[in-house]
């Protein structure tokens, strides 16, 4: 059994947070990895901005304001540059990043990385290409996220859902573009179709607060399009999200160069929801083009693929079954094993 310490100084959350409401991707990843490592027999402590000390599913959640230990077998610093130098006598230090690594060029990151030389862990092949080759480090590892077990065991649907598309990502990542396309091309071709949006700043904590006005403008526009089948609602906790995805026929998401994993599409695909996107950022890693969804090269082909999946039952079923077969294999236990290999 190894002693594993994880530190995060972002938003306030703990192991019970996914059960209480929607949670950002990086935060959900910390919870899932910590629990998977405990499941593999390790002692895991998470030091973060949780409201109070808590043990949940075997993971010790401890307010970081009280300090961190000096030693561990594996220390995982999550995102923040101030965390890199903590737990100084850890046998192996890891810097786990989730956003494109361009920001690591900032002097405060370069200095902290130069002093500690941790292994930088990226969450996908595209993500790894954003790490500058000259960046000080003790190694570079690619460890994709796993999928929560709730997403990995869906059965094939007996009949297709109604012509309902769903969007569950950051509204600043292409939702305006999608609303344009919905109004100009998709809805006119299929007036009975609906676009259900579950998005908002609450998922992103303080970062969402800083972007709340910009998000609100896009979401207000979505609400104004109710007459053409657009339904705008709040982000959903996990159980309700799974239900909404299973009742949707296709996930529509343009993609973004800042998308390093895209849990929204990964979860939809694992549940058998075909997806239409463009080949931006990590989206080619999430969709098997022409098999579990479509990677559209332009707006016209995006609209055509969307309409086809909303309308054509045979096309939908083929991609639905392929997604169930091919897109739900990687678990958080798999990801935990990859982190285990970093322990000296």
Q: Where are the model-predicted features located?
A:
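Short glycine-rich donor-binding/catalytic loop of glycosyltransferases
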Residues: 256, 273, 277-284, 298-299
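Donor nucleotide-sugar binding/catalytic pocket of nucleotide-sugar-dependent glycosyltransferases
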Residues: 117-132, 136-152
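Conserved acidic donor-binding segment of nucleotide-sugar-dependent glycosyltransferases
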Residues: 289-300, 308-313
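Extended catalytic core of nucleotide-activated donor transferases of GT-like folds
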Residues: 47-116, 126
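Short alpha-helical segment that forms part of, or immediately flanks, the ligand-binding pocket
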Residues: 176, 242, 265-270, 284-285, ...
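Conserved catalytic-core segment of nucleotide-activated headgroup transferases in glycan assembly
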Residues: 149, 157-224, 231-232
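A charged, aromatic-enriched C-terminal amphipathic alpha-helix characteristic of glycosyltransferases
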Residues: 314-343
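Acidic donor-binding loop of glycosyltransferase active sites
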Residues: 245-260, 273
